[in-house]
Amino acid sequence: GLVITRYGHDVQRPLPDRKILVCEAAHPVPDEAGLQATKNLLHIVQALQKDDQLLVLISGGGSSLLTLPVAEISMSDLKSLTQELLRSGAPIEAMNVVRKHISAIQGGNLGRLAVRAGAKVDALIISDVTGDQPGDIASGPCAVDDSTFQDALNILDRYQIGPGVAPASILDYLKKGTIGQAPETLKRDEPESLMVRNHVIATSMQSLLAAQKYCLEQGAQVHILGDQITGEAAQVARDQLEIVRGYVEQNQNKDFADRPGKFRRQVFISGGETTVTIPQGVVGRGGRCSEFLLALYAHSKDLAGLSALAADTDGIDGSEENAGAYFDQEIIHHANTLQLDEKTYLDAHDAYGFFLEVGGLVHTGPTLT
């Protein structure tokens, strides 16, 4: 067997006779190590025989780690496009439509290859996307795909990644696909699609329910705002603050005490996949969760006693090594003492830098999801 994971995430746990090779590669922008690891995986699939069973474990990050561009597209061009997509503010589902159509392994191609070799295929999937659709997770290496080459071109156009920005090799290949000169992703009417089974075994909502259970055990009252939250991270933060403010205003004259003199804590929990649009010329540091939290901090000065945490369930938020960030009254006091201007950090998309200064970064290491 073979595992492809992010650099630093090979936990070196004992494996029976070490028959499972662990390869590390880059995320979120793919690299040559990921390309070689994916080629190794392809060799395993090509060696399958009739009635073999292929078990595929899929989780977030696979769109980058499992990387094998079609022959017409170089790794250099794939890296360039990935960087543009990440800066564009496109939601992950849209990004993955493009990725599927320039990949020899995603968009159901892994499943298709295994079935054509005569194998039975089961994919066990941990979802990190809204909607929990197998085709959206890691760009769906074993899943059917309803999108088209034209959809991919439309997405690049919508996010202004057209000629002069996207590599010409990629635009040319996508255009060939629209006129039938390149193979489509795995479709529902293909016989191979019936031989691949996808099972989503963990979702964002399960994480929210686990957090809810813990908070209830601590005596708090919990409000789940949903597990399908999308949009620009900073705007989502402002929207959720309005929900909190509305709750406070409606209930400020009510007694929510568990017992006289002690008010019950209120906890608001949400999950989803936000986006961050990075303007040209801005480098930025951090990820969606950290930016969400910095915007929440910047716009919540009127809410006394507020504490907040935002983190990725896989332990990595964007470009750095932190899972996310948090703030409480001590962090707020420290930021005020340092006289940091959170708006400057927000404009620079440097949430990582802000929370590094105030000691609010959250580090979990690999969570193995």
Which residue ranges define each predicted feature?
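Short beta-strand segments
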Residues: 2-5, 56-60, 86, 123-129, ...
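Glycine-rich oxoanion-binding loops at beta->alpha junctions
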Residues: 3-50, 98-99
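Proline/glycine-rich low-complexity loops and linkers
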Residues: 24-25, 29-33, 86-115, 316-345
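Gly/Ser/Thr-rich active-site loops/lids in small-molecule metabolic enzymes
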Residues: 73-90, 145-160, 281-308
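Internal helix-turn-beta structural module
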Residues: 282, 293-369
